[in-house]
């Protein structure tokens, strides 16, 4: 049974979500604040997180940010107001995977939950024993850790991690925006011109320091982006030929 964790300070909304998803064979935990939310995350397996941005005294985006750096759990943002493009950019930067505005239909909400579950990184990837070595970095797939040559760890959101893996699997191959959208798991109906550009900019900033003068992730004008570096890969400690 898949576990959905919901944070919303609206009691009626929590009851509605719990009742509806339970009918459709989900385990649902609904909480009102980040303290309860984090307690559940630390003690139980969660398959999808639903985060309300309007939490009164708390910042829903900060909850999204914290979760994205700790987990690959898909996050659906719900809001009482229609999200503008700027809000979506911020949410994508922080690691959100889907958006829905109140009031919403229960059938649509259920459909989005199911899509998020389908798009979650597969069990095969969590058992992936590959490590990629490039420039001054190591990316461990199973542990989802990006480590610098000096030993420092850089936190990646789920979208950034998926995007980097796509580049490392095909170094120096030009990848179109469409390919990168699929790789990063940005939902097609939420795509707009800046979706991939935002993720690329953030990934450049984390890898290179100066995203305005990229040396690793380069632009192929009119075609997409490519990763311009030698990449070595090992499988469980054994370097590939």
From Swiss-Prot:
Signal sequence, start to end: none
Source organism, top-level taxon: Bacteria
PTM field: Phosphorylated by wide host range (WHR) VirA protein.
Modified residues (4-aspartylphosphate): 52
CDD domains associated with the record: REC_OmpR_VirG, trans_reg_C
Subcellular location: Cytoplasm
Stored InterPro entries: CheY-like_superfamily, OmpR/PhoB-type_DNA-bd, Sig_transdc_resp-reg_C-effctor, Sig_transdc_resp-reg_receiver, WalR-like, WH-like_DNA-bd_sf
A GO biological-process term: regulation of DNA-templated transcription
GO-annotated cellular components: cytosol; protein-DNA complex
Ranges annotated as DNA-binding: 129-229
Protein keywords: Activator, Crown gall tumor, Cytoplasm, DNA-binding, Phosphoprotein, Plasmid, Transcription, Transcription regulation, Two-component regulatory system
Residue stretches making up the Response regulatory domain: 3-117
One MF term in the entry's GO annotations: phosphorelay response regulator activity
Pfam family membership, one: Response_reg
Described function: VirG is required for the positive regulation of at least two vir loci encoded by the Ri plasmid of A.rhizogenes.
Protein name from the UniProt record: Regulatory protein VirG
Organism per entry: Rhizobium rhizogenes (Agrobacterium rhizogenes)
